[in-house]
């Protein structure tokens, strides 16, 4: 290999221009926490040789299946698979979904080598059905490998990781599509300004968010992608979400106020990412990414599982050749103007609310469950109409024409588990909002202030609660497992008082007050600040009710 350690697959001039080889040559650190800090700081980013050594070490330490193909396997099979075909003309495996091989700083020989390696990976991993990130991973690894066989072995170890708590790259359409939905949920929570812009300019927001992995695995320039991959190998999948969120934040900062077209926003983001050096350095991108105070890996895994479950229930497990990705029937499609009738909100307002709900439920269409004008002003009838539906949307219109409400994650039948006593239940996906006189949404306080909580110690006992709190006997059966308060150590239960219902009142939010309190006759209500949502009053603090509605979420396929 030529100095400073480039192999025969790399264009030396491009590599010199992309990465200055000025960094340290050795790494003695063995502690994971220190390694995390060094990866984030880019300790080996300026040394081609050291990055190669670090990749070798980190990938070697990935726990893998007992029989994982190594370099010798590649040497045995490559000739049979490739034959006498020119490597530049080799077809790519179907599982890359027409993703092109990013050249980065590879020469023509290197680009051909990536194709050979991908075909050999397809041969050894027949269970991979969808993996558009793999060409970028192999292309990057080839820059830092001695030869094709070593690069193949590294890729095999990443694909063969069998640590259940360590997710690397998606290898099925179900995993990929649920990650897109999860990313959409995270954007909704942590990049609300950018999400609002995407909703305004795109008819199908999930189609924009479905591109998130491409931003990282293909569009980012080498010096940026390599920095992301450095941290990814140490910290895992969560860093990918972080960086993609940071990219969207920078895109919004640059493009807010500029005209965006619905049919071009996807391409606009790709172009922005390709030219990201004009906007932000790799250091600033990672700095922004790690300034986002995301939930724990465990909570994100719960959300991913919930999204996978929703897709399975809809029969979406493989990509259909005749249609695009499972479309979030978003905004203009989910809420049909010709079919939608409400005494409280307009179609436009319902579309605004729909843009806030979790991705797995935004796939559904609104279904009117209860209307005070149709079913009467009775809380008992409200419960009867809502039971069996999860989640639900509560809408309230006051006699002063104020409009407010709540997204409620859990079936109201849960209230029956408290033996007639008033007990709180629900999850941190609940939120409250007002629409008139102005729009404002208030989410669970922990989303904005994660310092309120920390992951519970192993086998920790549940703290005693002033009010009863419900936990499902089988969390896998819950439709809304994400952000269940039982997964957190909270200083008090006032931060997790989501919803409660008795015969004489309905409450949303608690601690220091109630975000919403409605009496048993659906006649009077009150609203104030509460600890759970850290909200301002949603309307006049004491109000008379003109109308109440409850809406469910109906799968279009069941209509």
UniProtKB/Swiss-Prot annotation:
Molecular function as annotated in GO: GTPase activator activity
Tissue: Highest expression in brain.
Top-level taxon of the source organism: Eukaryota
The protein's role, per its UniProt record: May act as a GTPase-activating protein for Rab family protein(s). Involved in neuronal projections development, probably through a negative modulation of ARF6 function. Involved in the regulation of synaptic vesicle trafficking.
PROSITE patterns: TLDC
Consequence of changing residue 501 to R: In EPRPDC; results in synaptic vesicle trafficking defects when expressed in a heterologous system; does not affect localization to presynapse when expressed in a heterologous system
Assembly description: Interacts with ARF6.
Keyword Cell membrane belongs to the record: yes
Keyword Phosphoprotein: yes
Disulfide cross-links: none
Protein name, entry field: TBC1 domain family member 24
Reported effect, residue 147 to H: In FIME; significantly impairs the interaction with ARF6; partially induces neurite overgrowth when overexpressed in primary cortical neurons
Biological process, per Gene Ontology: axon development; cellular response to oxidative stress; dendrite development; negative regulation of cellular response to oxidative stress; neuron projection development; positive regulation of dendrite morphogenesis; positive regulation of excitatory postsynaptic potential; positive regulation of neuron migration
A Pfam family matched in the record: RabGAP-TBC
Impact when changing residue 251 to L: In FIME; fails to induce neurite overgrowth when overexpressed in primary cortical neurons
Primary location: membrane
Alphabetically ordered keywords of this record: Cell membrane, Cell projection, Cytoplasm, Cytoplasmic vesicle, Deafness, Disease variant, Epilepsy, GTPase activation, Intellectual disability, Membrane, Non-syndromic deafness, Phosphoprotein, Synapse
Residue ranges occupied by any TLDc domain in the UniProt entry: 343-554
Reported effect, residue 110 to S: In DOORS; uncertain significance
Species lineage: Eukaryota, Metazoa, Chordata, Craniata, Vertebrata
GO cellular component: cell junction; cytoplasm; cytoplasmic vesicle membrane; neuromuscular junction; plasma membrane; terminal bouton
Modification type Phosphoserine: residues: 473, 480
Sequence ranges assigned to domain Rab-GAP TBC in this UniProt record: 47-262
Disease: Familial infantile myoclonic epilepsy: A subtype of idiopathic epilepsy starting in early infancy and manifesting as myoclonic seizures, febrile convulsions, and tonic-clonic seizures.
